Swiss-Prot record:
Organism of origin: Brassica napus (Rape)
UniProt similarity note: Belongs to the ATPase A chain family.
Family matches, as SUPFAM superfamilies: F1F0 ATP synthase subunit A
Gene designation: ATP6
The keyword Transport is assigned to this record: yes
Keywords: ATP synthesis, CF(0), Hydrogen ion transport, Ion transport, Membrane, Mitochondrion, Mitochondrion inner membrane, Transmembrane, Transmembrane helix, Transport
GO molecular function list: proton transmembrane transporter activity
GO cellular component: mitochondrial inner membrane; proton-transporting ATP synthase complex
Protein name, per record: ATP synthase subunit a
Amino acid sequence: MQIGLVAQSPLDQFEIVPLIPMNIGNFYFSFTNSSLFMLLTLSFFLLLIHFITKKGGGNLVPNAWQSLVELLYDFVLNLVKEQIGGLSGNVKQMFFPCILVTFLFLLFCNLQGMIPYSFTVTSHFLITLALSFSIFIGITIVGFQRHGLHFFSFLLPAGVPLPLAPFLVLLELISYCFRALSLGIRLFANMMAGHSLVKILSGFAWTMLCMNEIFYFIGALGPLFIVLALTGLELGVAILQAYVFTILICIYLNDAINLH
């Protein structure tokens, strides 16, 4: 009876649990639940593409799954064409696969986290930060490859008085570095906050429903409807955050290419 009264923390759902611990010398590696669900996301994506294209490029009349993949493909392709300027269509195609894979990975990870008893990979700051910094380093390399040392002019707006130049360069450099940080924090914070809120309200509604009194049962209907509404909202947030992450990548890449 006492065990049933112990309240679980809404943050327990974000705990990384080692499934297969491994020790290599002084280094500790482990296959965790986070690794498992990232692998499941990748497997689902590869299987989906395989079943759609196994007959040699898809059906002439697309089925529902093929239509979904084509819709996502065209959506990201149009996003790249609209947000990245100053390049020919063939050059833009070089960046398209990376942006498409990033969008689909985040989309599937976010939606997978909505399944009960699953794990939300993007709710961990280190994972989103590693993703944002790795992409941002790649964007910076593209900027140096295209402009060389002239890429540093990105840090100094035109027409700035010389006495203010050192301060503005420092501020622009900090602002530039914080782009990668904010990119990871935005995704992590939205996914973690939304899932925690759904967990808190669903736990409250379940506790009210488990009580025998009719007053508590009626009182649980309000939180229950709120949970259902928040679940729908969280689905929208999962899709929106993948879109926001992707469009910001395109904007930052456009800035690096065109020195905006």
